[in-house]
A protein has these predicted regions:
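Conserved beta-sheet core of the metallophosphoesterase superfamily
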Residues: 349-428
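Extended active-site neighborhood of metal-dependent phosphoesterases/phosphodiesterases
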Residues: 160-163, 226-314
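Membrane-embedded segments
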Residues: 153-158, 170-259
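Acidic/histidine-rich helix-loop elements
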Residues: 176-191, 215-217, 248-272, 318-324, ...
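Acidic, His/Gly-rich catalytic cores of divalent-metal-dependent hydrolytic chemistry
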Residues: 18-21, 31, 55-57, 61-68, ...
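Non-catalytic terminal accessory segments
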Residues: 1-153
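Beta-strand-turn-beta hairpins that frame and shape the catalytic cleft
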Residues: 163-177, 292-293, 299-311, 337, ...
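Active-site neighborhood of phospho(di)ester-bond hydrolases with catalytic His/Asp-centered motifs
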Residues: 177-180, 208-212, 237-244, 295-297, ...
Length: 433
């Protein structure tokens, strides 16, 4: 990361933000005494310097259990300060644009004296107001992100009843628990994670389905949590799929070199490196040791009360260009045509619009995750919003189109920002009727 051009660009942008926000701080402290002004400025630059230092150190903190807390703390502070300053800067930018337009108008349409008089009459009140507004909104965002750190293990159970006209009588009342996006590499509190597993077990579900992203990057992230998640059991079994993070695409593999990139160019597609493939094989073993049946572009037959259904599971497949397409729904679907009811597990919800609806109208229910609801948003009765909705049309909860349904789980774990604001971690309980 530290060698990537993105990291240097981000570091430069952080420094630019620090100086830009400081200009607004100078406006607000202009009337303060010299001592008070000095103290405020020193505090500001101390915090900014610490954030920059954390950003520089972060890439050197290799993944270990001991480093998880430090990495999460550093990342939370960096992200919190960054977005708070970005939001605050929008207000400051409005003020700067206003002053530029006002100055230009004064030069073009008024005499110098008239322009200066107009500027003097409004610049202090408007500049101070917008500076205060920016600081308050930015501070409010930072406060909400700090509060959100306490929500990362506040598991919320969402209960949905789904009615299907073609559901066989023997499957009516089937109880499914869906879990998604565990991201075990982010956890720092094993007891809290276990409390979530206990909530799942208390549901006494017939079937438990996990829709991908067991780890952030590498299989050994699960080393300390095998004895937590191997407790997930259900009469009809526990089934799982891979998500985009499970392939290790975001990890710096030593053998992702020029030679490997040439192989990708010749193949015309993304290829796993040998080390990456070995890691994926280890992760397959993790699923097996947990007692989970990992579905890799295939289906299994499930039966209850004499009636049968098909459960399909595909590897990660996204309509978004930044995510490689590993899954093969055609392969998974082959042979399941005659089953009266079908459930598909596919990690990325964009799969629903891109392939499932137009090509497989007899897939009754798709279960997905991936979005996390961006771990930030607002959910109140009658209103739901998150920035992720501008990227994903289906990003949380239930969606219906004709006889087909999609449910997007908000995620059990977290990645990046180690918290949740408004969008809490989810355990989904589905009853088929």
């Amino acid at each position: 990361m530290r060698n990537s051009i993105f990291w240097w660009i981000f570091l430069g942008f952080m420094l630019s933000l620090d100086f830009y926000v400081f200009q607004a701080l100078r406006v607000l402290t202009n009337s303060a005494g010299a001592r008070a002004k000095l103290i405020i400025h020193v505090i500001y630059w101390t915090i900014s310097a610490l954030a920059i230092t954390m950003l520089i150190i972060l890439p050197y903190l290799h993944f270990t259990q001991q480093n998880r807390v430090v990495r999460n703390t550093f990342f939370a502070i960096i992200v919190g300060l960054f977005f708070s300053k970005v939001i605050a800067s929008i207000f400051f930018l409005v003020d700067d644009l206003r002053r530029v337009i006002q100055w230009a108008a004064g030069k073009l349409f008024f005499s110098n004296t008239e322009g200066e008089t107009m500027e003097q009459g409004v610049k202090i009140s408007r500049s101070v107001f917008l500076s205060w507004a920016g600081m308050i909104v930015g501070g409010g965002l930072f406060s909400s992100l700090v509060y959100g750190l306490s929500n990362k293990y506040r598991y919320r159970t969402h209960r949905v009843q789904l009615a299907f006209d073609n559901l066989p009588a023997g499957l009516k009342g089937l109880k499914i628990v869906q879990v998604s996006d565990i991201h075990s590499g982010s956890f720092t509190d094993k007891a809290a994670v276990m409390r979530g597993v206990d909530k799942i077990l208390k549901e006494k579900a017939d079937l438990i389905l996990f829709t991908g992203d067991l780890v952030n990057d590498v299989a050994h992230e699960m080393d300390g949590y095998m004895d937590v998640f191997d407790k997930l059991k259900a009469p009809m079994g526990v089934y799982s799929i891979f998500g985009n993070h499970d392939y290790g695409d975001y990890h710096s593999w030593p053998d992702r070199n020029d030679e490997h990139k040439r192989k990708e160019e010749l193949a015309g597609k993304h290829l796993l490196t040998p080390m990456q493939q070995a890691n994926l094989d280890k992760l397959k073993d993790v699923h097996a040791k947990l007692g989970w049946r990992l579905l890799l572009d295939e289906y299994v037959e499930l039966e209850k009360n004499g009636d049968k259904m098909a459960l399909l599971g595909v590897q990660n497949w996204s309509s978004k260009a930044r995510f490689p397409k590993y899954g093969d729904l055609k392969k998974a679907y082959e042979g399941s045509q005659d089953y009266p009811f079908k459930i598909l597990m596919s990690h990325d919800p964009s799969h629903w619009d891109a392939q499932v609806k137009p090509t497989y109208p007899d897939i009754d229910l798709m279960l997905a995750g991936h979005t996390h609801g961006m771990q930030f948003g607002v959910e109140i009765p009658g209103f739901r919003w998150s920035p992720v909705q501008y990227v994903y049309k289906e990003w949380a909860g239930l969606y219906e189109d004709g006889k087909q349904k999609l449910y997007v789980n908000r995620g059990y774990g977290f990645i990046g920002y180690p918290g949740r604001v408004g969008i809490l971690p989810e355990i989904t309980v589905i009853e088929l009727t």
